[in-house]
């Protein structure tokens, strides 16, 4: 029986490349000369460092631009509050969302069941497995989910025949 998984995860290689490009641009830009502005990437979070609130926003704009150019959906980013660190420096932590949350998984399953397409959807950890008798049914489910669930970036992988 054909099946696929609905997941929510960013391409971490592209995120890393975007962070490196953003840091390179920040180091060469005139308005950042003499400031300690940078973006750090650790596991599932990014940390923006800058001298003041305005420069944090500028660093964020550069990062967003680089992520968009590398086709990374910015809806994966979850911004935390800005924090003051030593002296006049500031930082902001940005968490990268991974996995389908419980509420979103229930919404996806309900949307699939309400569509009356002959497929079964089941929640498996941080993914939703969709199985059906025909490949065409699965493709119509993918198209329907892309249209219905637009507030969260969804990926479809592990497609099996």
UniProtKB/Swiss-Prot annotation:
Keyword Nucleotide-binding (UniProt): yes
Matching InterPro entries: DUF520 (IPR007551), UPF0234-like_C (IPR035571), UPF0234_N (IPR035570), YajQ-like_sf (IPR036183)
Parts forming coiled coils: none
Keyword Nucleotide-binding annotated: yes
GO cellular component, as recorded: cytosol
Single GO molecular function: nucleotide binding
Assigned keywords, A-Z: Nucleotide-binding
Pfam families in alphabetical order: DUF520
SUPFAM superfamilies linked: YajQ-like (SSF89963)
Protein function: Nucleotide-binding protein.
Entry-linked HAMAP family: YajQ
Family: Belongs to the YajQ family.
Protein name as annotated: Nucleotide-binding protein Rpic_2826
